C-alpha cells in the first residue's frame, strides 16, 4: 500500500511556533513517527492477538467469551437487525477492511505492479501456486465431509504481518522484494475474495441477490457519469451490505464491490492544477500584509479555500479514500478483529491431541509446506519457462524468504475458518490453533532466512 507520510509545514523565524506548541510536539512527533512506520500495523495486530490468547487462557476467559456474544441490535419501527458483537465485527467492521482491499486491488491493476503484464506475471503465478498447493495439502489430510470445508483456510496471506516482519529487516532486503510480496498478497486477497464468494456462501435468497446486482449496476452507473462524492458510494454501499447480509453471499463482499466502483480519475489534470496553483500563490503573496491574521482577510481566506478545493480535485477519490482508511483499518479494525477472533482456549494438559487433529494438521501442512512449495515452485517454473524474470536485485533465495512470509495467514485465514465451520466452535478452535502456530513459525523462519541472506552478497539468479 502506498501510504507515504505527508511533509509538514515548518514555521519559519518570522512566524515561530509558540513555546507550548513546541513542547507538545516533542511528545507528539515521536508518536507520529511510530504510527507511520511500516512495522507498526503488524506489531499492533500481533499485540492484539497475544491479548486475545492471554484473555482466553486466563481467569477472565469466561467474561471474555461472554463479551464476544453480547447481542447488539438496531430498531427502526418494525424493522430490526440484531447480531452478537462477534458477528458485528466479522460482518460489519471487516466490510471496511475488504473495502480497503478492493481499493488496493483497483490501484494495483490500474497503475501498480499488476498493471503491466510482464511485471504482473510473477506475483500472479506465485499467488496462484500459493493458493492451489496449500488447498491440496489441506484436502489430503481432510477427506471426510465434516472437515473438508476448511480447504480454503491455508490459501490466505496476511499482508500486515508479512510486511511488518519484512520491514524489521530494513535495508537487508531489496525494495523489489517488498513490491513482489505486496503484489503477491494483493492477488492472494483477490483469490480469497473469490473463494469466499463462490464456495463459502449460505443458501441464496435470490430476491436479495437480484437487488444486490441492481445496486452494483447503480454504483457502476454513478462511476460512468462522473459522480465523485464518496458519500454517494458509501450510502449505496451500505444498502448493498445489508442486501448481501440477507442474500446468503457474505456481506463483506459489498466492501470490495463498492471499492471497485470508486472513481480513479482526478477532476483536474496535473498541468491545470500546477498553472492554477501558481496563479493562486501569486495572488496570495500580493495580498499578504505583514503580521495580518488570515481571519481578518477574506480575500486570502478565499484563496486558501480555492487552493484546498484544487488539492482535493487533483487527487482521485480512490487515492484519498485509501489514504484516509489505511490507519483506521490497520490500527483499529484489524486489532479489534484479532481480539474478537484470536482468543483460543488451550488445554495444555491435552496439547498433543489438540495439535494432532486433522484440521490443525491440515492448516499447518497447508500454510507451512503448501505455501512454501506453491510460491517458490510456481515462481521457479514461471522464470524457468521464460514467462517472467526475477525482480531487480533479487535471487531465488529472496523468493524463498518471501514464500516463508507468505505462509503467515492470520487475518484472512481466521476469517475463512469462521465461514467454513459455522456453528462448529470446536472445529474453528482447531483451525485457529493451526493458523496461530503456522503464522508464528513462518514469521520467525522468514525473518531469520532473510536476515541471514541480507548479510551475504547474493548473486542475482544464482540458484536458477
Swiss-Prot record:
Entry's transmembrane regions: 41-61, 85-105, 121-141, 150-170, 180-200, 207-227, 234-254, 329-349, 363-383, 399-419, 428-448
Top-level taxon: Bacteria
GO BP terms in the entry: regulation of pH
GO molecular function terms noted in the UniProt entry: sodium:proton antiporter activity
This protein's record includes keyword Phosphoprotein: no
Catalytically driven reaction(s): Na(+)(in) + 2 H(+)(out) = Na(+)(out) + 2 H(+)(in)
Keyword Nucleus: no
Keyword set, alphabetical order: Antiport, Cell inner membrane, Cell membrane, Ion transport, Membrane, Sodium, Sodium transport, Transmembrane, Transmembrane helix, Transport
Membrane topology annotation: Multi-pass membrane protein
Intracellular or extracellular location(s): Cell inner membrane
CC annotations in GO: plasma membrane
Function per UniProt: Na(+)/H(+) antiporter that extrudes sodium in exchange for external protons.
HAMAP family per the UniProt record, alphabetical: NhaA (MF_01844)
Protein family per UniProt: Belongs to the NhaA Na(+)/H(+) (TC 2.A.33) antiporter family.
Full protein name: Na(+)/H(+) antiporter NhaA 1
Encoding gene, per UniProt annotation: nhaA1
Amino acid at each position: 500500500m502506498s501510504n507515504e507520510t505527508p511533509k509538514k509545514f515548518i514555521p519559519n523565524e518570522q512566524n515561530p511556533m509558540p513555546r507550548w506548541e513546541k513542547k507538545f510536539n516533542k511528545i507528539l512527533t515521536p508518536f507520529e513517527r511510530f504510527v507511520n512506520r511500516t512495522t507498526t500495523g503488524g506489531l499492533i495486530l500481533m499485540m492484539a492477538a497475544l491479548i486475545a490468547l492471554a484473555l482466553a487462557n486466563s481467569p477472565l476467559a469466561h467474561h471474555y467469551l461472554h463479551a464476544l456474544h453480547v447481542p447488539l441490535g438496531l430498531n427502526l419501527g418494525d424493522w430490526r437487525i440484531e447480531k452478537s458483537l462477534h458477528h458485528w465485527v466479522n460482518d460489519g467492521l471487516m466490510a471496511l477492511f475488504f473495502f480497503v482491499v478492493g481499493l488496493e486491488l483497483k490501484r494495483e491493476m490500474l497503475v501498480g505492479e499488476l498493471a503491466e503484464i510482464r511485471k504482473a506475471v510473477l506475483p500472479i503465478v506465485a499467488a496462484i501456486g500459493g493458493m492451489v498447493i496449500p488447498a491440496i495439502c489441506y484436502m489430503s489430510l481432510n477427506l471426510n465431509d465434516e472437515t473438508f470445508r476448511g480447504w480454503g483456510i491455508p490459501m490466505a496471506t496476511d499482508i500486515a504481518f508479512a510486511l511488518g516482519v519484512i520491514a524489521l529487516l530494513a535495508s537487508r532486503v531489496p525494495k523489489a522484494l517488498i513490491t513482489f510480496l505486496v503484489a503477491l498478497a494483493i492477488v492472494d486477497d483477490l483469490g480469497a475474495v473469490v473463494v469466499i464468494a463462490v464456495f463459502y456462501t449460505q443458501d441464496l435468497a435470490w430476491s436479495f441477490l437480484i437487488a444486490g446486482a441492481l445496486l452494483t449496476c447503480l454504483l457502476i452507473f454513478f462511476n460512468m457519469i462522473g459522480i465523485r462524492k464518496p458519500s454517494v458510494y458509501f450510502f449505496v454501499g451500505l444498502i448493498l451490505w445489508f442486501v448481501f447480509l440477507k442474500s446468503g453471499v457474505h456481506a463483506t463482499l459489498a466492501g470490495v464491490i463498492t471499492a471497485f466502483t470508486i472513481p480513479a480519475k482526478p477532476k483536474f489534470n496535473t498541468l491545470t492544477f500546477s498553472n492554477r496553483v501558481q496563479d493562486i500563490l501569486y495572488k496570495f503573496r500580493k495580498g499578504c500584509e505583514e503580521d495580518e491574521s488570515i481571519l481578518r482577510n477574506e480575500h486570502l481566506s478565499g484563496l486558501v479555500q480555492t487552493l484546498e478545493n484544487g488539492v482535493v480535485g487533483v487527487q482521485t477519490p480512490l487515492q484519498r479514500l485509501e489514504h484516509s482508511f489505511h490507519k483506521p483499518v490497520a490500527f483499529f479494525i484489524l486489532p479489534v478483529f484479532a481480539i474478537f477472533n484470536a482468543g483460543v482456549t488451550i488445554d495444555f494438559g491435552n496439547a498433543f491431541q489438540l495439535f494432532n487433529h486433522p484440521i490443525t494438521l491440515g492448516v499447518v501442512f497447508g500454510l507451512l509446506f503448501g505455501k512454501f512449495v506453491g510460491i517458490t515452485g510456481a515462481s521457479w517454473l514461471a522464470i524457468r519457462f521464460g514467462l517472467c524474470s526475477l525482480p531487480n536485485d533479487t535471487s531465488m533465495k529472496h523468493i524463498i524468504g518471501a514464500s516463508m512470509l507468505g505462509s503467515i495467514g492470520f487475518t484472512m485465514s481466521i476469517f475463512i475458518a469462521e465461514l467454513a465451520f459455522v456453528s462448529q466452535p470446536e472445529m474453528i478452535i482447531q483451525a485457529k490453533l493451526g493458523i496461530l502456530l503456522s503464522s508464528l513459525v513462518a514469521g520467525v523462519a522468514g525473518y531469520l532466512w532473510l536476515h541471514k541472506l541480507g548479510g551475504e552478497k547474493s548473486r542475482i539468479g544464482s540458484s536458477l
